[in-house]
């Protein structure tokens, strides 16, 4: 898939024919790359997010099958500070995909609202919205909070996700400003 995308982008570049559809594909790919990259940093494999019944290895109340976690433990010394598990992550059973976001308060907001959230809808809105936009974009290293941007419509629909996460808006507005867009409030 990436080889075909690369070839098509190369052709359009040399034909001086920019295609905005490629930006949408690239932003979706970057979010997936970021989630998978942070999973790897956490010592988790892709099968972890494919298993609907998987539980985070950070939760002290659950035993994680070794098939989902490479060493059945994580190395705190090598985890970026932004991915260090919070008290909520350690105390509330949750799916490991929620551990992938580099904003601790955002992770806590998601975990605390688990019962009332359609996680399939949330995941779709993050990765592949029906309106053609993505809810989150990643512009750099996935473990760096400043690499992540939330879209305007995502903030409107899922405002509680970033409640108390002022830095998310600061970083998002930085990226929006670089593209000449108005800042989020």
Where are these regions (language model features)?
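Transcription factor C-terminal regulatory/effector domains that mediate ligand binding, dimerization
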Residues: 1-185
């Amino acid at each position: 898939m990436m080889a075909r995308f690369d070839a098509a982008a190369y052709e359009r570049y040399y034909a001086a024919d920019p295609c905005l559809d490629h930006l949408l594909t690239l932003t979706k790919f970057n979010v997936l790359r970021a989630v998978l990259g942070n999973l790897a940093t956490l010592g988790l494999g892709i099968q972890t997010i494919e298993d609907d019944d998987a539980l985070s290895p950070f939760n002290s109340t659950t035993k994680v099958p070794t098939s989902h976690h490479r060493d059945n433990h994580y190395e705190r010394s090598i985890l970026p500070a932004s991915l260090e598990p919070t008290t909520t992550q350690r105390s509330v059973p949750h799916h490991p995909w929620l551990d992938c976001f580099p904003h601790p308060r955002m992770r806590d907001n998601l975990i605390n609202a688990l019962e009332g959230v359609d996680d399939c809808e949330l995941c779709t809105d993050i990765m592949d919205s029906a309106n053609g936009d993505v809810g989150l974009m990643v512009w750099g290293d996935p473990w760096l909070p400043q690499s992540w941007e939330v879209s305007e419509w995502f903030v409107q629909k899922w405002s509680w996700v970033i409640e108390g996460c002022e830095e998310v808006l600061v970083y998002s507005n930085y990226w929006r400003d670089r593209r000449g867009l108005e800042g989020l409030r």
